[in-house]
Amino acid sequence: MRLMEVTQQRIDTINESGSMSGVGAIHISEIEPTLDYLEKSLGMDLKNNVLGSVGKKEFSGDIDVAIDVEPEAMPELLDKLKINPDIIDIAKSSVIMTKVKIAKFDANKTCDRARTGYVQLDFMPGNPGWMKTYYHSPADGESQYKGVFRNILLAVICALYDRKDSAEQTEDGRSLQSEQYLFSPTKGLVRVRRNPVPKKNGQGYTKQNNNVIIDGPWLTPDEIVNVLGLDKKEDLNSYESLKSAIEQNYPAELTAKILDSFANNKQIQDIGVPSDLQIQEDVLMYMRKLL
């Protein structure tokens, strides 16, 4: 398998930039009253379906809520939100973005982001149980790094752990058939058979791959750690806990390959390689100079 297959992989993340006009951060003490009010107004369970770092950090850039709704029911949900007076603004992309008023807003609580009295609340369609696992974010003090670091490391582990590649390869170095795990934002952890897609003219292969699910899905943290050969569900909490778990459970060669692929991932390169991996790379470079 080419390293580029893993290092160029992008992972879905929760966006905290606030795409709606006039929204700002929300303090942890304001989240529950805001959701309590909206639950009564909308007749929906919101508090049990929040995702990411909401309620784990002092301030959140927005509120993300999983909604178990079928695609054909989305127009009805949109209409319901549009006519509700507590939904001040609404827009749809891959999620439903809304602007809502913060209940019991305390202007004295400030942070390095704007505090406007309004917050963006995103409704994200999907299986709430799985989305809580996929979009898990560590609490304050639990990790130096955001949940995206954990998710990318977990995706790399899935791509390399118990991977089976055929000896035959394409001209650009891909195996003609691979079996691997895939950490999917919509399907859960699944086992797939991957084949490069042939060109229509029959001359070689395109850059695309075709994945066929052959086992799974595994949706709960307990199931995932069992399938991936780890110890306990807490291993999935953060980048640090996941890195420690593979160092304790995987052969040194596989661990090194996973961490090298993670450090070379394009997203990780863009947001910054964790300092512990930078130190390891500096030591390796020094040792190479001595040889």
Task: Show where each model-derived region lies.
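Active-site nucleotide-donor binding segment shared across nucleotidyl transfer reactions
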Residues: 35-75
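Intrinsically disordered, low-complexity eukaryotic regions enriched in glycine, serine
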Residues: 37-41, 69, 81, 90-95, ...
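Short, surface-exposed acidic
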Residues: 46-47, 85, 166-169
